[in-house]
Amino acid sequence: MSSRKLTLGVSLKMYFGYQQTLDWCQKIHEIAEQHPLASLPSARLFVLPAFPTLAPVVQRFAQSPVHVGAQDLHWTDNGAFTGEVSGTMLHEMGCRYVEIGHAERRRYFGETDEHFALKTAAAWRNGLTPVLCVGEEQRGSTQQAIDTCQAQLAAALNLAQKQQLTGDLVLAYEPQWAIGSTEPAPTAYISEVCQALKQHLPTQAGVREGRIIYGGSAGPGLLSQLGDAVDGLFLGRFAHDPAAFNAIMDEAFTLSSQA
């Protein structure tokens, strides 16, 4: 069987209610338990639910091939930070991943590259794998997109590198202009950007294992079209239907068999 890296992740953002999240996770658990993709050593599956559901979701997936992560974390490990959650607590409760750098954090909460550098360092310091989102705001040339993403990656890793921290990293390429749209960015465009990022990521100090996934209106067929340019997909609303997530798993497994 192929050792090709394959990663499928889902962020539920704030779309689901509490019970709806638990019901969805139960269905995903049932799918993953029986799907051949989940048994591949090189496959990674993760879900990022809302904070109030993390404890029961971690418990639900405790004996499952699906890992759980958070959609954010604070950059310090404890202290008087009302409303915040530390990487220390996330790791203690069983989280494996944490999302950092999403465009919505920039747009709605004023977060900057400096915040993302602090959070990336906090994630590695606490044994969490950052799902680091990068992407250009406006569509231009692929080289402009590559330059933007590489600059965002360098900024996010800057502090962790200074502190000589190491860890795994999932780099999620999400062109901001494609997030929430009805169609993803053109396949050739995504492929060129992700290929460049895939070659660039191993050169970054501190990154033990790096994976490149695409997000931004990702759906069925895209993984096959992108081929080796990406290691997987970062899914949003499409995966709200468990059957749709199952279809993406089918596609990923087929690709692993052909590699």
From Swiss-Prot:
GO terms for cellular component: cytosol. Pathway: Carbohydrate metabolism. The keyword Transferase does not apply. Gene3D superfamilies: Aldolase class I. Involved in catabolism of D-apiose. Catalyzes the isomerization of L-erythrulose 1-phosphate to D-erythrulose 4-phosphate. It catalyses: L-erythrulose 1-phosphate = D-erythrulose 4-phosphate. It is an enzyme of class 5 (isomerase). The gene is lerI. Keywords: Carbohydrate metabolism, Isomerase. It comes from Pectobacterium atrosepticum (strain SCRI 1043 / ATCC BAA-672). This is L-erythrulose-1-phosphate isomerase. Disulfide bonds: none annotated. Belongs to the triosephosphate isomerase family. InterPro entries: Aldolase_TIM, TIM_sf, Triosephosphate_isomerase. CDD domains: TIM (cd00311).
